[in-house]
Amino acid sequence: MAKDLKKPKDEAKSKKWVATLMIVFASIGLLASFVLSVDAFTLLKDSDTQLACNLNAALNCVEVMKTPQSEILFGIPNSFFGMMAFPVLITIGVMIAIGARLPKWFKTCMQLGVLGGLAFAWWMFFDSLYVIGVLCPWCLTVTTGMTIIFGAVTHYNLRENTFDFKRPTYDKILKFLNADGDKLIWATVLVIFAFLAFAKFGIALFE
């Protein structure tokens, strides 16, 4: 039954969709990481400088970048790690796009890697929202991008049955994916995040 659910045309379309999302949003994440890294050096020279991403009282990169949470490992700005990780994701996206056959161990490591990135991005979002009390626009870009990338990679690995599900379970997973159930879940997550931000700051987000 799984073979009937995995139509070659659908598989090709799915891989193209996954690859496109990975390349596009990893590129956006790389841009955000680069800008934040440049801004980090700017702040070192002048801690009172005003950056372009200081939009209002609720959306302010500088206030977030001045906190310990912006440098959680060895005093290195978090954005530096993004500049190392996102090119890897872009490369993997290209590999999927050209039809490369990725080994199981590689796909498993890829899943664990994006899970780690998602966990960090979500932690930074909630910490900024409820502890720091200010949101960083570029950080929000990374959070959105990592959520979409994680969803895309998970979709890819589920279709590839990287985790060796039994046939009945795998059939159900394929039906769920074919019905775009996973896309609905991740879209809902992003809507919830937007709602939480609005609930916290209200109209201040747009002032």
Features from the language model and the residues they span:
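Interfacial helix-loop-helix junctions of multi-pass membrane proteins
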Residues: 41-50, 119-146, 199-207
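Hydrophobic alpha-helical transmembrane segments
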Residues: 76-98, 116, 120
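Extracytosolic (periplasmic/ER-lumenal) interhelical loops and adjacent juxtamembrane/interface segments
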Residues: 41-77
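Membrane-interface loop-to-helix entry segments
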Residues: 70-88, 135-147
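Membrane-interfacial, low-structure loops and terminal tails that flank and connect transmembrane helices
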Residues: 2-15, 160-180
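Hydrophobic cores of alpha-helical transmembrane segments in multi-pass inner/ER membrane proteins
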Residues: 2-3, 84-90, 142-160, 189-192
